[in-house]
Amino acid sequence: MAEKGKGSFGYLKKQAIKQGLFALGLLAVCATIFLIGFFWLTQHNTILTVIAVLGMLPVAKFIVSMILFMKAERFSCAPHLYEEVMKIAGDRKDDLLAGFDFYLTSYDKNFPLSVACVAKDCLIAYTPSENCDCNKCKEHFEEYMKKNGISGINVKVFTDEKKFLERFKQVRDDETNENEKAMYRLLLNLSL
């Protein structure tokens, strides 16, 4: 299980803060460049104004990312679920292909996954969202598995926490193969 970055517990909340701080920092740099040009050259029609305006493009990108992460963070893994998963994982927690706080986006739907695990040739995931279309999520995974040459992995998305934990107990003891590792990398790549 990942301790930092995608797949780590609290990732969505940390990323929302990180994106916001980057946006504020870049906004301050752009404002400083504009104000230096305005007060130093006493007009706003300068190359420094152009640089400041072009600098707003990355600021806008970070603001959009921040908004996406802020929207997704309400689906972060609950602390009690994290503790339960870690308890079940036990001494295998470093070997398991499992992670927390995934938020997948597609053209027409978004899929928040609090916990996901790849083992025994299957991807199991839990979503706390009652509105998550589990069949669409499965189709989304299968489409990208096909595009990436991954086969033989069954996808199951649970909306019931207890059923997910029961299935997680069943798959936790299995050794991982290369196909499962490729599937987990795909999960990380598809997530925000």
What feature does the model see in each segment?
Residues 1-99, 106, 139, 146-151, ...:
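Surface-exposed interaction regions that form or flank ligand-binding interfaces
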Residues 89-126:
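Acidic, Ser/Thr-rich low-complexity segments on the non-lumenal side of membrane proteins
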Residues 122-154:
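Structured, soluble extracytoplasmic/luminal domains of envelope-associated proteins
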Residues 156-158:
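Hydrophobic/aromatic beta-strand patches that form the interior of the parallel beta-sheet core
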